[in-house]
Amino acid sequence: RDLRMSRGLGDVYKRQLQDDPNMDFVPQTYLFGAKAAPGYHVAKEIIQLINSLAAQIDKDPVCKDKLQVVFLENYRVSLAEKLIPASEISEQISTAGKEASGTGNMKFMMNGALTIGTLDGANVEMHQQLGDENIFLFGLTAQEVVQRKQQGYHPMDYYQQDPVLKRVIDQLSAGFDDHVSYACLLYTSPSPRDMRR
């Protein structure tokens, strides 16, 4: 989830703000709250990527008062108590059928945040109870994920055919001003256990 968000955020930063610094842009703050288990290297790399992207955006004058990224270390209940009521959008974008979820998404919704989510975990029950008009669905269903795998999933095709995606992935692979390449994250799929919310 956080890796997907980082890719999307990279697009907002590069394509929208850097390519057109004078565009009308609604100021946005992206908050990431997570905790990496000690042995999960991929999760630690994703956290480093988020912090690297945050530092790059923070020092870019084009982003001042427009875009901010904050990573909340050691995400826990006391942070959630402050974060959840302040959130306007909750992105619950795990791969459908791949992750169990708790009730965090419900807490965001009950506090007024709009939910963008896949039909996975508790989002399924929320969608059944609240209907299409109260949740913004994203991505494939669990059945569609299985079908896509059976039909053959070739991510390189998407990379080669989508110039926006290619640009973001190339940037992540090259790294930012900290000169750290995140290419290893682009060619792996983290396990749901890698990031603990």
Where are these regions (language model features)?
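Residue-level preference for alpha-helix termini and adjacent loops
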Residues: 2, 74-78, 82, 125, ...
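Single conserved hydrophobic/aromatic residue that forms the stacking wall/gate
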Residues: 2-13, 187-197
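Donor nucleotide-activated moiety binding/catalytic core segment of transferases
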Residues: 62-106
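Catalytic binding pocket for nucleotide-activated donors in carbohydrate/polymer assembly enzymes
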Residues: 85-86, 93-189, 193
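Structural motif
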Residues: 29-30, 67-70, 89, 114, ...
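Long, K/E/R/D-enriched contiguous segments that form extended
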Residues: 1, 11-80
